[in-house]
């Protein structure tokens, strides 16, 4: 994220005041958005859920999340109430509701609000409400303030506390990439009991009310998420009070941006402090990037030096071998010349040492007649 874009975002958020006068902090957005007309959603019928955790498995595989400590067929994890985290974007919990002789199971994940509190609270606009109904997150814009975690009424966004260098927010995306390919969300596709129904939100609202009307006594006469917090893409049916399955029934119907704008705006603050704090956050981020770049450059430098040293060693070894080979060749030639000279000398000496043949002249020998 470059400095120009960062400061531009600060300007659009109304946080670049340079006069340090007493004022009131404002949320990044105070407007309302009724949602996309033909957006999609999911209806979760908790009366059908059997707590098999197949949805958790599908979510893990589709999003390539880390392997869990307990296998997905290990149902002992249901003995404790869990919440989503950076490595688990959806979880199923078991509840023992009063008056029932069997447990109730409910899947938990991002509800993909029509007017997301996370998007409203995020001053760098790292969250996006998409036309397909999903709410997605762009980690390249995030500065790690975690306002989204505070703003979310459903406690969904999770921070990667275990990541030391580049922690990000993690949450369900409603399988946004799969929707773009015309596929169902992974959890919906794998559910063996059709406890999850995917479709256009307006159709799901109708389906939910039809089930309530056609099955008297089976459901609470309410579709959770139809109106809560201005409405959510993920909605619920239940046979017991929603509070019995850990859901907040006191949220009201006012949209989340109105709540977050009021909450942030109620905090008295010196306006001039915001640029300092946020520029400081930017500086920390840039310093981290600079250190990483320096470490990378140093690693490359060391690698080049090591390669050069290795090449020098190889060259020295080759030259030494060449000198040794040359010396050996000279020694061989000298020895050869000496051997040839010795051989020639010995041949000449042998020739000189041979006796001369007697002369053939017989005149004047005694006893011969004149």
From Swiss-Prot:
SUPFAM superfamilies named in the record: 4Fe-4S ferredoxins
Cellular compartments annotated: Cell membrane
UniProt binding sites for [4Fe-4S] cluster 1: 49, 52, 55, 191
Annotated positions binding [4Fe-4S] cluster 3: 110, 113, 118, 152
Membrane topology recorded in Swiss-Prot or TrEMBL: Single-pass membrane protein
Binding site for [4Fe-4S] cluster 2: 59, 172, 175, 187
Residue ranges, compositional bias (Basic and acidic residues): 345-355
Residues annotated as domain 4Fe-4S ferredoxin-type: 40-70, 101-132, 133-162
InterPro entries membership: 4Fe4S_Fe-S-bd, 4Fe4S_Fe_S_CS, FDH_Electron_Transfer_Unit, HmcB, TAT_signal
Function: HMWC (high-molecular-weight cytochrome c precursor), ORF2, ORF3, ORF4, ORF5, ORF6 in the HMC operon form a transmembrane protein complex that allows electron flow from the periplasmic hydrogenase to the cytoplasmic enzymes that catalyze reduction of sulfates. ORF2 is a transmembrane redox protein.
Entries under PANTHER family matching the protein: FORMATE DEHYDROGENASE, NITRATE-INDUCIBLE, IRON-SULFUR SUBUNIT (PTHR43545), IRON-SULFUR PROTEIN (PTHR43545:SF4)
Protein name: Protein DVU_0535
